[in-house]
Each structure stands twice: as C-alpha cells, then as structure tokens.
Amino acid sequence: MAKYEDGVMYYFIINPASQSGRGYKIWKKIEQRLVRDGVEYQAYLTEYAGQATEYARKLTSHCKEARVIVVVGGDGTMNEVVDGIVSCDMVTLGYIPVGTGSDLARGLRLSRRPMRGLRRIFKARRIRQIDYGVIAYGDDVLRHRRFIVSAGIGLDAEVCQHMQRSAIKNICNRIHLRRLSYRILGFIQYLKAKPIRGYILLDGTRRVEFNYIYFISAQIQPCE
C-alpha cells in the first residue's frame, strides 16, 4: 500500500447505509487496512440524515491544526459534510465514493474502487480546489446551505425525496438497474406534477420569467 503521511490523523465520516447498506461492509474493509498499516484515524458513522453535517461542524470548529476528513458514502453524505465545514483553511477533504449514483465521483473522474480511492488519498501530492454552491431559503428566517453536486426544486427534488424511501430503489440496486428506478419514479412524479409560473434572477439584475416551470436545478458537476 502507498505510504501514508506520518503524524497525520485521518478523520473518517462514514454513511454505513449508503448503497443499500454496502457502505458498512466497505468501511470494515477500509478499517482493516488502516489497522494493518498503523494509520492514525478516528471514525464517525452516521445514524440519521444530517449527522454528517454535525460531525463535520464538530471536527472543523476552532481547529488550529491541519485536518484531513475522508468521506465514505454517496453524494448526499458528501453534501452534508461540505455544508457542515466551518471556515477553516486547514481542512482537506478526501472522498471514497460508495453511493448509488456517485455523480460527484463521475464528475471528478474518481475511481469507484474503495481501496484504490484510499491509496489515492494517501499518496496525493497535490490538492484540487473545486467549486461549491450556496442556496438561500426560508420566509421569516433566511437559511443557507452549501452543495457540491447540484440543488433543485420541483420535480427533480420530488423524485430524489421519494427515491430515498422507495422500495423500488433497493430492488433495482440489487439487480444493477439503478437508472430504471429513477425512470419509474420520475415518470410517476411527472404524471402528478403541476407546472407553475415563476422567474429567475441572473447576476442579481436580469429577471427572466417562465410560465411553465416543472423544476429548477443548479449544477456544479457535469454528471447527475
């Protein structure tokens, strides 16, 4: 295995439920390798939605030394971690994709093989800077949230929300037909959807109005 950097503590944030529970099995294999090679690490396994954000906030608040945080999970887990990071120039993110879609991994051309991803993190000689987006929402109280892949409202968000709790997703994943699950749920939600009127503001000045809006989506990565 590639030599890791001596004296560096690696903080792993893991979603064990990612990819229909495969995330936990992959993490145990990674952990065995870490123990075998004497890597200093701390592991934080999520148990509910939003906990990855809490872990990231806890790890990056008031940090005075370099922090290497490695995310083991899907796009949703990575989004939560990015949203939770407190402004700190000392934080470096690593990513081992274990998601159903892994759009971020495809966009960044990262390997889907966990051990290869671990080696890439340990032998990295340079740090890549990537963009993230920020959405503002709320009526009485304005809230902000970061995202690293995409953010949407309307039909696409409805499909994603139903996908999280749909039995169709798990069934299709087991038989390697992930795209089919999106098509089925997408078609169902399309039949239920009702377009609305609205507008977008470009660069804070130019207002563009639309009469039939099914969804609005902002993309950071080329894959979704």
Language-model regions, residue ranges each:
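Active-site-adjacent beta-strand anchor residues
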Residues: 42-45, 71, 94, 149
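Phosphate-binding core of ATP-grasp and ATP-grasp-like enzymes
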Residues: 217-224
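Short amphipathic alpha-helical segments
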Residues: 24-26, 82-85, 106-108
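Glycine-rich beta-strand-to-loop/alpha-helix junction loops that act as flexible
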Residues: 16, 72-74, 98
